Amino acid sequence: MARTFTLIQIRTRARERADMVNSSFITDSELNGYISASYAELYDILVQSGLLYFTPTAQTITGNGSETYAVPSGYYGTVRVDRQEGSNFYPLQEYMITERHVHENGGGSEARVYSAQGSNISLLPAPSSGTYRHIYIPAPVDLTASADSTTIDGVSGWEEYIVVDAARKMLQKEESSTTGVERDLLRLKERIEEMAQNRAWSTPRRVVDVRSDKSDSANWWRTTGTL
């Protein structure tokens, strides 16, 4: 991604869009809060596409006999969990709550399945040892108190969503009409949701067999050394 803008640039564009360039009715601090909330909404839309617009981060978990392990403070959502053996990684399957009894009663020293639960990752059976790699999407940066030089990636003009949504909030507080910006916001959202699916051009999105024995963490031929 290369289309980046600073927080002060986004703030200026939002003021221009709301026709409040020289107005002190909305302070910069308050506008930063609007922008931060709008950025988080754009972040949600891009994550929902299922494609990696934001670089996943890895957390190392060491089994100690417990079932649950705290996720990092900057956690948004889990991509996958792998069990490590040497230089190889074996993918764990995600379990549904209705399947819990099957796995917690299974015994064994190594976890075979995982589940993201609140601020924790559940591994079952509770591993008494071993190393696990938790790959997750980080949460969006809180721009409320960020420096003016903080950059925002607009990908392909999608920063306009943040600009228009922040302008809408400014006009809303001023009790001015928001009809025009709401119409533009809807058009932008539809465009982003459609085009966000086109991040990978060479390989079409496909259904993955997650119940096959080949995806079980006990099978060596499904190893992976990298994400």
For each of these PLM feature ranges, what is it?
Residues M1-L227:
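Glycine-enriched, solvent-exposed interface loops adjoining structured elements
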